[in-house]
Design a protein with these regions (language model features):
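Serine-hydrolase catalytic core
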Residues: 200-255
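Catalytic active-site module of serine/aspartate enzymes centered on a nucleophile-bearing elbow/loop
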Residues: 265-292
Length: 292
């Protein structure tokens, strides 16, 4: 699955074809057993992933990655099914609108709508844990800033290799350009143009690095040491700490962008997901279902 995103970013390819290929690649996902996948039509559509055992009243609202131009609940079934099994929690994945058909801030608007939908189902703000990867990580952090400003603070947030700065100003873009195994800088900049289409790159709804945070909840970030987006994690962590937040930045050597997608193929993916489940347990006083 990771190779499809890499191919799209590395070489000229129609975004719609790349999106289709990414969806098709999900057939290779090693989905954790006993996964229940239900869908609900709406704006946006919501996908509910769970195992047969769970913790009532607790939920993860997860925003998939894919550079805002591809991805879905289906493409992320491997890591999300494993997280559902490790935590025992239901994971809700919105099908937020994608660029270039729906440029920024469409995804942010859908993220807010997904959160409203969970509140309408009876969840309290403190029962909602935000999770995400890559571009979805930026989206989740942008939503968290908005929720904190409106006193709807979530329990916490975890993010895998988050993309937090659409101004592309991090020094690791230059420093790690030759060693990042997944993301070429040039194609990332082209993707920025597809997503923004004139929208300000430093707007907090697309770049949470520039958002004000009012007493943010605990945050857990995992990122590869060789990623060009490494500084997106480091700088985001500092912004949150400056706002009084508690942040763990878990850096992994030798792991590509969102290596969690390779659960079932490489041991580092499972280990990272187990660590994430342990973080989730600290938020909700749960006992993680280790190594399932």
């Amino acid at each position: 699955m990771l190779h499809v995103t890499r191919q799209w970013l590395a070489a000229p390819k129609d975004v719609f074809r790349a999106r289709k290929d990414f969806e098709s690649s999900s057939r290779f996902a090693r989905v954790a057993p006993y996964l229940l996948h239900l869908s609900e039509r709406g704006t946006p559509d919501l996908h509910y992933l769970s195992v047969r055992r769970g913790n009532a009243g607790k939920v993860v609202l997860y925003f998939h990655g894919g550079a805002y131009v591809m991805g879905s609940a289906r493409t992320h079934l491997a890591p999300l099914s494993r997280l559902a099994r490790l935590t025992g929690l239901q994971i809700v994945v919105p099908d937020y609108r994608l660029a270039p058909e729906h440029p920024a801030p469409a995804a942010f608007q859908d993220a807010v709508a997904a959160h409203v939908a969970l509140l309408a189902k009876g969840y309290q703000p403190q029962d909602i844990i935000l999770g995400a990867d890559s571009a979805g990580g930026g989206l989740a952090l942008a939503l968290m800033a908005d929720l904190c400003a409106r006193n709807l603070r979530p329990a916490g947030l975890f993010a895998f290799s988050p993309w937090t700065d659409f101004a592309m100003s991090g020094d690791s873009l230059r420093r790690n350009a030759a060693i990042d195994p997944a993301l070429p800088v040039g194609r990332m900049r082209e993707t920025v143009d597809l997503v923004l289409q004139g929208f300000p790159p430093q707007d907090p709804r697309i770049s949470p690095l520039y958002a004000p945070f009012n007493a943010p909840p605990p945050v857990f970030v995992q990122v590869g040491a060789e990623e060009i987006l490494l500084d997106d994690s480091f700088r985001m962590a500092q912004v949150l700490r400056d706002a009084g937040g508690q942040v763990t930045c878990d850096v992994w050597n030798g792991c590509p962008h969102v290596w969690h997608m390779l659960d079932g193929y490489i041991p580092e993916a499972r280990a990272a997901l187990v660590a994430t489940a342990a973080f989730v347990a600290t938020l909700q006083a749960l006992v993680p279902i280790a190594n399932r």
